[in-house]
Amino acid sequence: KTADSIIKNYSAMLNEMHSEQEELLSPSQFKLAKTRILIRIALYRSIKNHTKGEDALAHTKKYFYAKVKAASKLVKFAGKSELGCTLFRKAFSYGLRADTWISAIKKNDKESLVFDITKCLYKDLCDFYKCPELCMMFCDGDWLAFGDMEKLKFERKYTLGYGDELCDFKFTKQSR
């Protein structure tokens, strides 16, 4: 009975979020919000309506981290070869041009890709829906996605989701 109620609440909440954000976001921002962010926020808030906040967060993290691990297989595969690393770097730097971030590339050559993000749609939407703890989950997901590549080392000291002024991404070529 609780599961049915959560699912019903989730669907209604997600539809409401879609209607709300479609008017506020650009088409590219809305596409990312719809496919990657709002589904997690709606899930979390729906579970939270039926259980304690920390339990809702634990369930949402478990679901999200499983999805990230599955998706990270392609990144890990790309990170096994020189060509894959080059393609990863080019694709990532291209993606940074989207209006879902405000970013500054500090270095992009065959040795490394280093950039800062000072505005992020994930953070903006988590703040909008008053769930900053979920933004930390999204930030932590980067470690699952990028933390175990053979030829590229991922480093980051700061994240917007943890209250810092920026997210500092650094991918450095390494020999293993």
Where are these regions (language model features)?
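N-terminal, charged low-complexity regulatory/assembly segments
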Residues: 1-44
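Short, flexible segments with low predicted structural confidence
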Residues: 15, 117-119, 140-141
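C-terminal non-catalytic interaction appendages of large macromolecular assemblies
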Residues: 113, 124-125, 129-176
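A sequence-level detector of short, solvent-exposed, charge-rich linear segments
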Residues: 12, 25-28, 62, 66, ...
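Amphipathic interaction/junction segments at domain boundaries or subunit interfaces
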Residues: 32-130
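Glutamate identity and glutamate-enriched acidic tracts
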Residues: 16, 20-23, 54, 82, ...
